Amino acid sequence: MDFPGLGALGTSEPLPQFVDSALVSSTSDSAGFFSSGPESLDTASSSTSPNAATAAATALAYYREAEAYRHSPVFQVYPLLNSMEGIPGSSPYASWAYSKTALYPASTVCPSHEDAPSQTLEDPDGKNNNTFLETLKTERLSPDLLTLGTALPTSLPVTSSAYGGADFPSPFFSPTGSPLSSAAYSSPKFHGSLPLAPCEARECVNCGATATPLWRRDRTGHYLCNACGLYHKMNGQNRPLIRPKKRMIVSKRAGTQCTNCQTTTTTLWRRNASGDPVCNACGLYYKLHQVNRPLTMRKDGIQTRNRKASGKGKKKRGSSLAGAGAAEGPAGGFMVVAGGSSSGNCGEVAPGLTLGTAGTAHLYQGLGPVVLSGPVSHLMSFPGPLLGSPTASFPTGPVPTTTSTSVVSPLSS
């Protein structure tokens, strides 16, 4: 944004330099410069000093441009020169927007003439030299014209923001509405405005616990842990500190005796119809037969069922399958299959036929016989270990019927 009267920034024309000591120490020019808005600027422009007239004209042009931009319907801009009390509409924005107290008197960034001796004592580094004073006077013309390389000293008692906003009392909002900065945390006001209560070492008055997900209170106001508080709320008394002993195992109750067989050892104690204790065996017997268990069935030891699967049956089944596999081995590459016998059993090997030897039976295990339906037996070729694919060994045409079960020579391939 171009400001009229500030074209000297882009050209070789230097900024107005206040080198006259009378301008530095004089308060009349300063009072006329910041007293009553544009009227005071017009009065200052008619001053006899040419440098003061140039500075007043520049500030007046900047003020008018800022007023026109501030009232734009698109961009709402708060007055940048709100530190000047005489400018209309220049009340400190930050103080009335966030503070509930009265408005603080606006103050400028630059110290007044009366503060100069105290700053000289507080500034041992010599920052109150001519260069620093010229920078501060340039800031009076426009805050945007500050030299980027020059920063304000930390020892300078600045009581307002760079744009003249009042000292803001609350640490949670900055005068411009920005989030908290690191300077706000280091401010003494920030530490004083948040009084933090010291950590209390709570302890349950009943069990002495110091850690619990929820602290409760009894009727007298003492702290209770969550467990003790719930117990007191449900039962109306304090929770016992010592856990009750677990119930003794039923089978090991001392002095318990079965009323039927007089045994003292059992896996489970039961009760009969009259409520007397009985052992597990007598109780189950009475439950199934509705009669007391006979004393002749009593045994000294406790008989338990073997719930593990026995391997005897598996061994017998494996041996039977091995014998059947040895009998199913073909001899000479052929197998005779009975198609339809008088007994109605289809798929049985013809009786009286010896199939292979025991040494070659393992080669054909897992290959069952081919079952065909028909009134008589059929002769089917069976693939041997050296004949290749089984599909190439079987005939594709119709199988001729025979009147008797016999073994013939192998078919020529």
UniProtKB/Swiss-Prot annotation:
GO terms for molecular function: C2H2 zinc finger domain binding; chromatin binding; chromatin DNA binding; cis-regulatory region sequence-specific DNA binding; DNA binding; DNA-binding transcription activator activity, RNA polymerase II-specific; DNA-binding transcription factor activity; DNA-binding transcription factor activity, RNA polymerase II-specific. Residues 117-128 have a biased composition (Polar residues). Pfam families: GATA. The modification Phosphoserine is found at S26, S49, S72, S142, S178, S187, S310. SUPFAM superfamilies: Glucocorticoid receptor-like (DNA-binding domain) (SSF57716). Residues 203-222 are annotated as: Required for interaction with ZFPM1. Highly phosphorylated on serine residues. Phosphorylation on Ser-310 is enhanced on erythroid differentiation. Phosphorylation on Ser-142 promotes sumoylation on Lys-137. PROSITE patterns: GATA_ZN_FINGER_1, GATA_ZN_FINGER_2. InterPro entries: Transcription_factor_GATA (IPR039355), Znf_GATA (IPR000679), Znf_NHR/GATA (IPR013088). GO terms for cellular component: nucleoplasm; nucleus; protein-DNA complex; transcription regulator complex; transcription repressor complex. A zinc finger (GATA-type) spans 204-228, 258-282. It comes from the Eukaryota. Residues 395-413 have a biased composition (Low complexity). Residues 109-128, 297-325, 392-413 are annotated as: Disordered. Interacts (via the N-terminal zinc finger) with ZFPM1. Interacts with GFI1B. Interacts with PIAS4; the interaction enhances sumoylation and represses the transactivational activity in a sumoylation-independent manner. Interacts with LMCD1. Interacts with BRD3. Interacts with CREBBP; the interaction stimulates acetylation and transcriptional activity in vivo. Interacts with MED1, CCAR1 and CALCOCO1. Interacts with EP300. Interacts with CEBPE. This is Erythroid transcription factor. The gene is Gata1.
